[in-house]
Amino acid sequence: MDKKPCNSQDVEVRKGPWTMEEDLILINYIANHGEGVWNSLARSAGLKRTGKSCRLRWLNYLRPDVRRGNITPEEQLLIMELHAKWGNRWSKIAKTLPGRTDNEIKNYWRTRIQKHMEQGDQSSSTTFNNGQMNLDHSCNDQASSSQMSACGPVVDHTAVDQSSYSPHSFNGNDHTFQAPFPTDQSNDNMWSMEDFWSMQLLNGD
């Protein structure tokens, strides 16, 4: 029993980027006949593409209401909010953003938002680790400082005070002595050498 020959259209299915000619064929056909069933549309339009390829090309790029340009900050906030609520339900999210396709939103999320969030998590982790290291070093420095204060050499203030004293000055039986750092008040209450010799002369007379 002989096998039936394969459909030539199945063999010649085109893959890869769409050409401008293919885009114009698809646009004109849908403008005249509507979307319909995509597998039948591809054959009827004479395109050597699968029905899925025609559908994605039309919905994501060729529709008149497809919004051009970069996603705005407002749209980005809405995408982040809805993704936190619905997860990866890109078609549902796309319905809240007129002119944006589910494929466009999915690509934007993965290449821009998700990547930025992952980098932010890594940066936060690095900052935390650095801060912890600085805190540990600070604690170690404080501990070392406290240990040095507790175990370091103790200054003998008594020895310093004793070494700063001048020898007592004796004159005969007089035991008056001058402090090493006299104040104005101590000078007023202490006899000078001139006063002392004056008293000696008076006693001699």
From Swiss-Prot:
UniProt note on tissues of expression: Expressed only in flowers.
Keywords noted in UniProt: DNA-binding, Nucleus, Repeat, Transcription, Transcription regulation
Compartments (UniProt record): Nucleus
Single GO term (MF): DNA-binding transcription factor activity
Domain HTH myb-type: 10-62, 63-117
One cellular component term from this protein's GO annotations in UniProt: nucleus
DNA-binding region boundaries: 38-62, 90-113
Top-rank lineage group of the source organism: Eukaryota
Entry-linked Gene3D superfamilies: Homeodomain-like
Primary subcellular site in the record, as a coarse category: nucleus
Function: Transcription factor.
UniProt protein name: Myb-related protein 305
Phylogenetic lineage: Eukaryota, Viridiplantae, Streptophyta, Embryophyta, Tracheophyta
